[in-house]
Amino acid sequence: NWDPVGVPSAIDSAIIGAGTVTVSQSVYPASLIVSSGATLVFTNWTTKLYVAGDITIQDGGTMTVPPSFLEGQMSNRVNLACSNMTIEPFGLITVAGKGYWVTNGPGRGYLYQRGSGGGYGGTGGRPYPDGILPVGQRYGSLSAPLDPGSGAGHYPSTNYTIHAGSGGGAVRMQVSGTATVDGTISANGESSKGEYGAG
């Protein structure tokens, strides 16, 4: 779905015109446009988009990663470097809920009656009504986050796994010039999806 067809080189101005393009290794185009309705998916933690010029995510274009993952599985992040970055209104970079899966990660939530929240730059939320019980622990950096967030806990039964939320994913942007964000960058963890599950 690259336009023109083929993995872009350092002399190419790349356009994702429609559909979904998945990158599993680093690429080095001269510039990049993610068009309206098109999606660029990053897989592998080390995959990086090195763009000598500008990156533009148009209205309705998206950069993202695959769904949340378990401890020991391959993690993913949106990882890019460019001169200038523009995210137009309704353009989107989202890794929301695409960090560690439920009860996974260094700051994973615990299994209680209603579970506890997963941690990252801060500790996870305490379970109600058992406010003295442990919660997902803090790790990483609050001011310069680099890692995925951990998944929340739930009632200790696999029947309630789907009620808890996964952690937020990771986005790293190195922009040497100007970053103009009129759209959205989202790395939120998931909220609770039902009774006895935390977010």
Protein language model regions, located:
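Extracellular beta-sheet-rich ligand-binding/adhesion modules
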Residues: N1-N84, S157-Y160, G168-T178
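Glycine-centric low-complexity/flexibility signal
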Residues: D54, T62-G199
